[in-house]
Amino acid sequence: VKRCCDEEECSSACWPCCWG
C-alpha cells in the first residue's frame, strides 16, 4: 500500500494523511 507521506517532506496537501 502506497502511503501519501512516506518521506520527511510533508506538503500541506499531505497533512491529513501524515498527521491524520
From Swiss-Prot:
One of its GO terms (cellular component) is extracellular region. GO terms for molecular function: toxin activity. Disulfide bonds join 4-18, 5-14, 10-17. Expressed by the venom duct. The modification 4-hydroxyproline is found at residue 16. It is found in: Secreted. The modification Tryptophan amide is found at residue 19. Residues 1-3 form a propeptide. Keywords: Amidation, Cleavage on pair of basic residues, Disulfide bond, Hydroxylation, Neurotoxin, Secreted, Toxin. The keyword Disulfide bond applies. The keyword Cell inner membrane does not apply. The cysteine framework is III (CC-C-C-CC). Belongs to the conotoxin M superfamily. This is Conotoxin PnMLKM-D0211. It comes from Conus pennaceus. The lineage of its organism: Eukaryota, Metazoa, Spiralia, Lophotrochozoa, Mollusca.
